[in-house]
Regions:
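Single, function-defining residue in the core of a domain
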Residues: 1-55, 63, 68, 72, ...
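Short Lys/Arg-enriched helix C-cap and helix-to-coil transition segments
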Residues: 87-100
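Conserved beta-strand elements of the Class I
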Residues: 110-112
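Extracytosolic and intramembrane catalytic regions of membrane-associated proteins
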Residues: 132
Length: 414
């Protein structure tokens, strides 16, 4: 059996066992929950949630306890879940992801993409922040917004932040994930429309990250203090100075007004210039536009060097962003995140982070899969659906050579 798979499994399970040694840190009622001897201890509970699939909780319990007559009931399982804080799985996700050693980079950068995706849950009106009422012909539902940073080269999620429908904010989520990122390598971030805010640029620059972000309006003629050329393709440099004061207020206080000055309105969030601040913030970037094969054009903003990343390179680079869209689909349908086993917010959060852990575990398993095995005239890749299934069974205790199975089910690259 492959040593890497064994090591990954032992790393994950040892983290769960270590968390079980301090149940009060993850219990809703510390000192009372998880103190009595039960069949469903904290480590067993986390293990069961982690390996749940679309089958009912009762069937999962029967499988774990090998069809014993004293198998805990589904009701007992739910009662134990309600004692566990979602923070347990969030911490497990971060610890396990930090333990991984991805090797692939893009020109020396960790190539990340940021995006958000909605997750629909059963109706639970008690949670007003996520509840959306239906109509006379349709029941209401609850909606969660999942924000994530995804490593496009290595196929793993590096961070996740879950928000509720009525309190969501992708800009705020991005800034929070950037600020708390533990990545030590240079980072290059790709993002779609909606992330082109000054505050986002500033947080990225403060961390020393590079970015390539699509602008909201591809046909716009004015952006970030400059008039854009009336051309299907261009590459220009912009440099503006941001401030909170009006030009009159700056004159009254004896502050010289820069030529490329842009005032930020009080309702525009910018963490480095609080409302009323007299400080200035200089922002510079490249704005590029290129034509697509269908004749349309896209406009992007970046702080990448023009010599290292000319216009054709940016066009190819931005196309890589689609990888995070594919990953969300795999997360929901291959890993099975859409098969929620509860409608309560705390239990849904448990399952969301469990799905991300299983996703990263499955991807890390595939890193050493030999895709050149056998004879084929096509380039091939691992069947991720098979990888998830085998990883889940491997975590459940199956003694299998995962990589031998994966070699037999390679798919041609389309």
């Amino acid at each position: 059996m492959n040593r890497t798979a064994e090591r990954l499994r032992e790393t994950l399970l040892s983290m769960i066992r270590k968390m079980g040694e301090h149940p009060k840190d993850y219990a809703k009622n510390p000192g009372r929950d998880f103190t009595r001897r039960r069949s469903l201890t904290l480590p067993i509970l986390m293990y069961l949630i982690l390996t749940m699939d679309e089958k009912s909780a009762w069937k999962g319990l029967l499988g774990y306890f090998q069809n014993r007559i004293d198998t805990p009931s589904a009701s007992a399982f739910v009662q134990q879940r309600q004692k566990l804080l979602p923070r347990a799985f969030e911490e497990l996700f971060r610890c396990f992801t930090d333990s991984l050693r991805p090797e692939k980079t893009f020109h020396g950068y960790r190539l990340l993409a940021v995006d958000g995706s909605s997750l629909k849950a059963m109706s639970y009106p008690e949670d007003a922040d996520s509840y959306r009422p239906g109509t006379e012909l349709q029941h209401g539902w609850n909606l969660y917004h999942i924000n994530a940073l995804y490593d496009l080269e290595n196929g793993i999620y590096t961070d996740v932040l879950v928000q509720k429908e009525h309190t969501k904010g992708e800009d705020k989520a991005l800034c929070e994930m950037v600020d708390r990122a533990s990545l030590s390598e240079p980072v290059l971030l790709l993002a779609d429309r909606g992330y082109e805010a000054y505050n986002n640029f500033a947080h990225l620059e403060q961390r020393g990250w590079k970015y390539l972000i699509r602008l909201r309006d591809r046909d716009r003629t004015y952006a970030y203090g400059v008039t854009l050329p009336d051309s299907p393709e261009f590459d220009i440099q912009v440099c503006i100075t941001l401030g909170r004061l009006t030009k009159r207020q700056m004159g009254q206080q004896g502050i010289s007004v820069p030529e490329s000055y842009c005032r930020l309105l009080p309702n525009v969030p910018f963490d480095f210039l609080p409302p009323g601040s007299t400080d200035l913030y200089t922002f510079s970037a490249r704005i590029v536009r290129f034509k697509l094969e269908n004749g349309a054009s896209e406009t992007l903003i970046t702080n990448l060097d023009a010599e290292q990343f000319p216009l054709p390179a940016l066009k190819q680079l931005y196309a890589r962003r689609w990888g995070i869209e594919t990953s969300f689909r795999q997360l929901k349908y291959t890993v099975g995140l859409i098969h929620l086993h509860s409608k309560k917010p705390e239990l849904i959060l448990q399952q969301i982070f469990s799905a991300f852990i299983l996703y990263n575990f499955s991807q890390a398993i595939t890193w050493e899969a030999d895709t050149t095995w056998g004879h084929s005239k096509y380039r091939r890749h691992v069947n991720f659906s098979d990888a998830v299934y085998l990883s889940c069974q491997f975590l459940r205790g199956w003694s299998i050579d995962i990589h031998a199975f994966l070699r037999r089910t390679l798919l041609p690259c389309r």
